[in-house]
C-alpha cells in the first residue's frame, strides 16, 4: 500500500488544476502510512523528520489535515511593546493573508514562547474565523483552548491545552 501511495502521488501533476485532487487523495491516508511512503521515496528506512513530542488534536474524528501551509508566528507571554496601531495592522494583514490564500490551506502557526507557552491563539474565535475563510485546519507548537466550542470540520493539532489567551499577538506573517 505504501508503494501504491508513492506511485500515485508521483503520477499526479502539482499544477493548480490537479492540486485539489492530490490533496483529497492524500486525506485518505494516516500519518504512519505517509511516513512509510516517504521511506519508499527515499529508498531507505529510518525517516525521522517529524514531531517527536506528544501533540493533542481538537477532534480525533476529523479527517487528516492536508493542505498548503499558511505560516505565521505569534507570542502571548508578554504584551507587545510596539504601538497599538502597528499590532492591529499586522493582525489585519494576517487576516487578509488567509482570506486570499489557496482554498484547502492549513494554518501553521509557531508560538515563539515555546516551550513556555501561556496563551492560546486557537480557540473558538480564531478557529471560526479561519474556517469561514475555508482554511481546513491548524497546526501549532502552542496552545489550544475552548475545546467544547470549536467548530466541527476545523481540526487543530496543538502542543498542549491551556485556558488563557494571554497577550496573544501576531509577530510575523508568511515565513
Tell me what each language-model feature is.
Residues 112-114, 143-146, 160-163:
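Acidic, glycine-rich active-site loops and adjacent beta-strand->loop/helix elements
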Residues 140, 150-153:
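Glycine-rich phosphate- or other oxyanion-binding loops that anchor nucleotides, phosphorylated ligands
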Residues 47-50, 74, 108-110, 138-142, ...:
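General beta-strand structural signal in soluble alpha/beta enzymes
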Residues 155, 159-175:
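Acidic, glycine-rich flexible loop/linker segments
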Residues 96-141:
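Extracellular/luminal Protease-associated
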Residues 11-93:
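N-terminal low-complexity or amphipathic/hydrophobic leaders
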Residues 62-65, 98-102, 131-132, 148-150, ...:
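Solvent-exposed alpha-helices and their adjacent loops that cap or buttress functional pockets
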Residues 2-7, 86-104:
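Short, composition-biased local secondary-structure segments
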Amino acid at each position: 500500500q505504501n508503494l501504491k501511495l508513492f506511485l500515485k502521488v508521483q503520477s499526479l501533476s502539482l499544477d493548480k488544476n490537479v492540486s485539489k485532487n492530490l490533496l483529497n487523495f492524500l486525506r485518505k491516508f494516516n500519518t504512519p502510512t505517509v511516513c512509510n511512503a516517504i521511506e519508499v521515496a527515499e529508498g531507505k528506512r529510518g525517516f525521522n523528520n517529524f514531531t517527536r513530542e506528544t501533540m493533542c488534536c481538537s477532534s480525533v474524528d476529523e479527517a487528516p489535515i492536508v493542505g498548503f501551509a499558511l505560516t505565521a508566528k505569534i507570542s502571548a507571554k508578554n504584551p507587545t511593546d510596539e504601538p497599538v496601531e502597528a499590532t492591529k495592522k499586522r493582525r489585519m494583514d494576517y487576516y487578509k493573508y488567509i482570506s486570499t490564500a489557496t482554498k484547502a490551506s492549513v494554518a501553521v502557526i509557531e508560538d515563539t514562547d515555546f516551550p513556555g507557552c501561556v496563551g492560546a491563539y486557537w480557540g473558538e474565535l480564531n478557529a471560526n474565523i479561519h474556517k469561514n475563510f475555508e482554511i481546513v485546519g491548524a497546526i501549532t507548537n502552542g496552545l489550544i483552548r475552548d475545546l467544547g466550542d470549536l467548530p466541527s470540520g476545523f481540526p487543530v493539532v496543538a502542543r498542549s491545552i491551556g485556558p488563557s489567551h494571554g497577550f496573544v499577538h501576531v509577530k510575523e506573517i508568511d515565513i
